[in-house]
A protein has these predicted regions:
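Bacterial Sec-dependent N-terminal signal peptides
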Residues: 1-11
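Acidic/His- and Gly-rich active-site-bordering loop/insert found
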Residues: 9-112, 121-141
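Residue-level signal for inorganic ion chemistry
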Residues: 33, 160, 261
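Short beta-strand motif preference
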Residues: 85, 194-196, 259-261
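Histidine/acidic-residue-rich, glycine-tolerant segments that coordinate divalent metal ions
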Residues: 103-111, 117-118, 134-256
């Protein structure tokens, strides 16, 4: 038992040292992705940088997988086990990245509030470290880095799964930036997204309201009924919505309205 633990610790130390020796390089990659701050399905620079980083380490890179320009799979090695490491690199909308103790106007820009600049980079570092171990030890095994775009509401991985890109994977490893370094078992809720669009008839809200048919009324009626539905769902159910289009002026009956749902 002691010998087995010693061997495992030695393997761990070799892999960890591989990452530590390249710390400054990975820090530079993370900082660049931070500066790009690209939203889902628009991560052109971030995706290209991660592909370049992995390619320079001997990975073969297949880009544009699942018909998504910013999705890719980088592979090294052969045979089993096939280890997948997932990387994300999309930012969130409407966020400032300046480190100040007060809220700044984001001016419709995006920011890395969820730490995906670290997510994508550290996953690449882990994949490279495993690659080095496979190479140096001359052992069988395949390491695959999955460049997964649009995690923040875009369901990028769903399309990759549908394309069968994970069909040969034995184990998939995933992580997320947090305020502590730990590992734990857990579960997540499934998520369905949908946009509901309502169409009506525009009219002046003061001069001739009787001629209007408010699309916004349809959105509000739907939201009210959904809120009443909450009483009859299980405790683990989550339903969220935001009105994305509700009209342009209060004195005009809106002929179009839209609500965006997560459930």
């Amino acid at each position: 038992m002691f010998i087995s633990l010693s061997v495992a610790q030695k393997k761990y130390d070799v892999i960890l040292k591989s990452i530590e020796n390249n710390g400054s390089k990975y820090e530079n990659v993370a900082n660049q992705i931070w500066s790009f701050a690209e939203m889902g399905y628009q991560e052109e620079k971030s995706s290209a940088l991660l592909q370049k980083t992995l390619f320079e380490e001997g990975f073969s890179v297949k880009t544009g997988v699942a018909n998504i320009p910013t999705a890719f799979v980088a592979s090294y090695g052969s045979g089993s086990p096939v280890i997948a490491i997932l990387g994300e690199y999309d930012a969130l909308p409407g966020l400032s990245q300046q480190a100040v103790p007060y809220k700044l106007s984001a001016n419709d820009k995006a920011g890395h509030a969820c730490g995906h600049h670290l997510f994508g980079t550290a996953s690449a570092a882990a994949a490279i470290a495993i690659k080095n171990y496979i190479k140096n030890q001359k052992i069988s095994g395949t390491i695959k880095y999955y460049g997964c775009p649009a995690e923040e509401g875009g369901s990028g991985k769903v399309y990759m799964v549908r394309e069968g890109l994970f069909s040969e994977v034995d184990v998939a490893l995933h992580w997320h930036a947090a305020d502590e370094n730990s590992a734990s078992a857990g579960k997540a809720l499934a998520n369905k997204t949908a946009k509901f669009r309502f169409y009506g008839v525009s009219s002046h809200a003061s001069g001739s309201p009787q001629n209007g048919r408010s699309a916004l009324d349809g959105v509000e009626a739907m939201n009210n009924m959904v809120n009443m539905l909450r009483e009859h769902t299980t405790e683990s159910t989550r339903i969220h919505y935001v009105i994305t289009r509700g009209g342009n002026a209060p004195n005009v009956v809106p002929d179009f309205a839209e609500v965006y749902y997560y459930a």
